[in-house]
Amino acid sequence: MVCVRSFCAIHPRKDMVEAVSALPYDVMNTEEARAMVEGKPWSFLRISRPEVEFDRSHDPAGDEVYARSRENLAKFIKEGVMETDAEPQVYIYRQIMGYHVQTGVVACAHIDDYIENRIKKHEFTRKDKEDDRTRHVKETDAHTGPVFLAYRDDAAIDALVAADTKGATLYDFVTEDGIRHIVWRSSTPKAYEDAFEKVEACYIADG
């Protein structure tokens, strides 16, 4: 069965979430990323795409670039822009795009489930991209980009999500592309760990 665990997240202070929020690192090229961070000192792209802070002639895979991602994450935390959970948590994340609504559980998955094929793969990945993100994780000591997993409908998990989404939100804002983002902190993180133990497999959708 699938192993899901709560975790201590590093997340934006509530009043800074819009300033930090950024698109995934791999949906734009470097020039587009440079444009996106202009006038935005707290954009998360300064952590996920730190090459934007270097001259265009600088090697984007240089040691200094990866070091900058670590330095910027530390700066965001030191300046209070981002906070660290004191206790392990599970989050519920909802995106609303026009008439389309999707809701997910934000938690940690286990590497053993990937190795033992309880997390199902659907495509090959490029080694250069794997190496880049692996080094980024090692340098920052953080997973800065989530993996999107799907699982078959489960009534127990649905009930937990329904209960948590009736509570107060942690974040509720709309990004420049018109997508509404809503996040709740679960009041029963252990219940998700127990519920996912009955899920036979997850499927990689993206990440």
Where are these regions (language model features)?
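A cross-family signal for N-terminal binding/gating loops and helix N-caps
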Residues: 1-206
